[in-house]
From Swiss-Prot:
Residues 61-165 form the THUMP domain. The keyword Secreted does not apply. This is tRNA sulfurtransferase. GO terms for cellular component: cytosol. It is an enzyme of class 2 (transferase). ATP binds at residues 183-184, 265, 287, 296.
Length: 482
């Protein structure tokens, strides 16, 4: 089985040196992602594409799914290679491969050719298209927007039959740009902004300012791990959690009501800048959008920026909320954001939309900055791959089991799409489906006399959700790992 990976167009217009560097990094990223599927996958880079080959036909779906989520890839072609003698032989093989698909359909033939031949690409298109039209009476040629496009590639003496095409997410390969630190809250905005910087070639680390206890932190870890696992798993990244409750308490006590929002954001920027400097990160990423809330006016954003010399990137600055939610839906973070626990430590009755620098600095003069230094120095830094292990250490009473008792119910908390693609079947075991994003609201409705074994494929989501349910007072929860 072979896949041909086509590069994002912006990569192809780079200088030769830059283009080769980008292709080399992309090939390395692909290897890092696919090595989790097996050792028998070969990745070979060329000037204008990257080949992925495997002898295991069963890995095709998983390989394709992984490739569609790696930044830097424009599209993926699943192909079959054959030898050919002449144009008529090309037609015969195209008819064999595509004939059954063209009955009662409109079609066109598209050919790309490399090498020296006695025919042109257009001549092959006309010859193959004419032959298919003659041999399949119910098929009709339609050059614009046909039902089926017969894609052929000719590389020297090899005919490449394109069996399927899958769209990638585009962008630049992760690692071609410098690292950034995303201020993630688990909501719509921060998840989308993190994805946009990953797609632009940055390795994204995560910084979370905890205002609402462990339940909020668990939810945010789920979002960060999901984003990394889905789009950025080719690289190691950090998840930094800062306990910001002491800072909030100091603001509530020392800062005027109308200035609290801007002061809190300035404190977050200062703390994030210290974290970024500690790990050699060049910029901070936020999900702020112009005018969305009172602290996000131009005047207030300028004052927030002035709190630090670190570059602050705001990829969503001109996006409206509806567009942001649509993007969250496309990348799969919408359900996380909708069910994320909401915590607001600083609530101003009349927040300023046009803060004055002198007033802000006067309010901050009352703030004990030793508190800020302390919470930053005590920030928890964890490799995002170790989130599951960290959860296990935090809550030792969450039991992991491999067998079932008579009263046990296996609770499949994977998303509906994952359950449909890879249904769970176990003989003699009661299995219920309850996606992770519905657990917090619907778990309490389940029969209390049963013990529920939470299951997900990697064990990360199930452990985090079990931790959350345990903190909510449920003692009939375990984690199932086959």
């Amino acid at each position: 089985m072979k896949f041909i990976i086509k590069l994002f167009p912006e990569i192809t217009i780079k200088s030769q040196t830059v283009r080769l560097r980008f292709i080399k990094i992309l090939a390395s990223n692909i290897r890092n992602v696919l090595k989790t599927l097996g050792d028998n996958i070969a990745v070979v880079r060329h000037w204008d594409n990257i080949e992925v080959r495997t002898k295991d036909e069963n890995l095709g779906v998983q390989i394709c799914d992984a490739l569609t989520r790696i930044p830097g890839i424009h599209h993926i072609l699943q192909v079959e290679e054959r030898e050919f003698r002449d144009m008529h032989h090309i037609f015969e093989q195209a008819y064999e491969a595509y004939g059954e698909l063209l009955h009662n359909k409109t079609f066109c033939v598209r050919v790309k050719r490399r090498g020296k031949h006695q025919f042109t690409s257009n001549e092959v298109e006309r010859y193959v298209g004419g032959g298919l039209n003659q041999h399949i009476e119910s098929a009709k040629v339609k050059l614009n927007h046909p039902d089926v496009t017969v894609n052929l590639e000719i590389d020297q003496d090899v005919l490449i039959l394109v069996k399927a095409r899958y769209e990638g997410i585009g962008g630049f390969p992760i690692g071609t740009q410098e690292d950034v630190l995303s201020l993630i809250s688990g909501g719509f905005d921060s998840g989308v902004s993190s994805y946009m910087l990953m797609r632009r070639g940055c390795r994204v680390h995560y910084c979370f300012f905890n205002l609402g206890g462990s339940a909020h932190e668990i939810g945010v870890k789920q979002v960060a791990h999901y984003l990394w696992n889905r789009f950025g798993s080719s690289h190691k990244v950090r998840f930094v959690a800062v306990d910001f409750e002491p800072v909030v308490a100091e603001i509530l006590e020392k800062v005027d009501d109308g200035q609290m929002g801007v002061v809190l954001k300035r404190m977050m920027v200062r703390a994030a800048s210290k974290v970024a400097e500690r790990y050699g990160v060049q910029a901070i990423v936020t999900g702020e959008a112009l005018g969305q809330v009172s602290s996000q006016t131009l005047t207030n954003l300028r004052l927030i920026d002035n709190a630090s010399d670190t570059l602050i990137l705001r990829p969503l600055i001109s996006h409206d909320k509806e567009h942001i939610i649509r993007l969250a839906r496309e990348i799969g973070t919408e359900d996380f954001a909708r069910t994320m626990p909401e915590f607001c430590g600083v609530i101003s009755k009349s927040p300023t939309v046009k803060a004055v620098k002198a007033k802000i600095e006067a309010e901050e003069a009352n703030f004990d900055f030793n508190i800020l230094e302390k919470v930053v120095s005590e920030a928890q830094n964890v490799d995002i791959r170790q989130i599951a292990e960290q959860s296990s250490e935090q809550v030792v009473e969450i039991e992991t089991v491999t067998a079932f008792a008579p009263t046990d119910v296996l609770l499949d908390i994977r998303s509906p799409d994952e359950q449909d693609d890879r249904p769970l079947q176990l003989n003699g075991v009661e299995i219920k489906s309850l996606p992770f994003y519905k657990l917090s609201s619907q778990f309490g409705d389940l029969p209390k006399e049963k013990t529920y074994l939470l299951y997900c494929e990697r064990g990360v989501m199930s452990r985090l959700q079990a931790l959350y349910l345990s903190e909510q007072g449920f003692d009939n929860v375990k984690v199932y790992r086959p």
